Amino acid sequence: MNRDLAALTDTEPQETSAPARLAPRLVAEAVGTGLLVTAVIGSGIAAQRLSPGDTGLQLLENALATGAALTVLIVVLQPVSAAFNPVVTLLERLTRTLSTGQALATIAAQLAGGAAGAVLANLMFSEPAITVATTDRTGPGLWLGEVVATAGLVLTITALTRSGRTQHIGWAVGVYITAAYWFTSSTSFANPAVTIARMLSDTFAGINPASVPAFLACQIIGGALGYLTARTLYPQP
């Protein structure tokens, strides 16, 4: 979801983005992922407090805030780097848009930013900085939901990229995630960095650490399916 996503095509890693250009990428990924997690967790806490006892309304509030925040973050940071998602970064490595070192550094920045975003959200709402989530999210239906959610996300990004319409990625991804909150059983985590960060807040958006490994596996599977589908639809980038 960034300028390198000329990206998710089959080009060699750009050596010109070594140290000097890697630093802005890492900052953008850390800040973007962090603020995304803050939006997810923070809006979940706000929804619980503002609409107690109405889970449907809470989810609507959480979905709208997350989708809006994600759209803005992509639009603002896309000229630098706006993946905010290790699945997308892994695809950039597989398609040789990034080198192995660049991809690993980017994922590390996403994970660190996500953790910081969880702490920030907790503190803003006067919660302890870190509380281990206790919400179990497990079972075949939820796992299938995560495969579908991530496949749709990657299909959206890759199809727009391979068809030369990257200017639409910001709003398309934001709208997709807002919708996927509702049409997937898992409420569309669709992002390993965000999933891991959500372990750190025992609030509306939290996920029990025991539920995380299966979610991560489903996200990787979904990412692969979404990418292969997009390549089939758009064989010539």
Stretch-by-stretch model annotation:
Residues 1-237:
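Membrane-interface helix-loop junctions and terminal tails of multi-pass membrane proteins
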